[in-house]
Amino acid sequence: MARPTKKGGAKKQKKNVPNGIAHIQSTFNNTIVTIADTRGDVISWASAGSSGFKGAKKGTPFAAQTAADNAARRAMEQGMRQIEVMVSGPGAGRETAIRALQGAGLEITLIRDVTPIPHNGCRPPKRRRV
């Protein structure tokens, strides 16, 4: 029986995007770095989990640094040079991720904290007793 020929999928072409926006979402359990162009189309992304960390290690500053480094490297392959950074969340990897983006060679023009603050919204989780 003849095997059907495989149709080639659409290859992602390299765009030349000189500047964009990096969104860093840092929670207690993970850090996600998404780099988009100024229109909002995602160029690259990485997280502590996608960078090879598992479990509690995903919440560490080193995992955030690795994730930011991976995302920055992929964005620079697309031609990105300047970024604005939007940081949200209370996690441990906030500052480390910003330093990693800078260390990778991206020029940071703006850092903005966009953490949502409730006007007494949801009830917070119960206090931990260790």
UniProtKB/Swiss-Prot annotation:
Disulfide bonds: none annotated. GO terms for biological process: translation. InterPro entries: Ribosomal_uS11 (IPR001971), Ribosomal_uS11_bac-type (IPR019981), Ribosomal_uS11_CS (IPR018102), Ribosomal_uS11_sf (IPR036967). GO terms for molecular function: rRNA binding; structural constituent of ribosome. Keywords: Ribonucleoprotein, Ribosomal protein, RNA-binding, rRNA-binding. Pfam families: Ribosomal_S11 (PF00411). Part of the 30S ribosomal subunit. Interacts with proteins S7 and S18. Binds to IF-3. Located on the platform of the 30S subunit, it bridges several disparate RNA helices of the 16S rRNA. Forms part of the Shine-Dalgarno cleft in the 70S ribosome. NCBIfam families: PRK05309.1 (NF003698), uS11_bact (TIGR03632). Belongs to the universal ribosomal protein uS11 family. This is Small ribosomal subunit protein uS11. The lineage of its organism: Bacteria, Bacillati, Cyanobacteriota, Cyanophyceae, Oscillatoriophycideae.
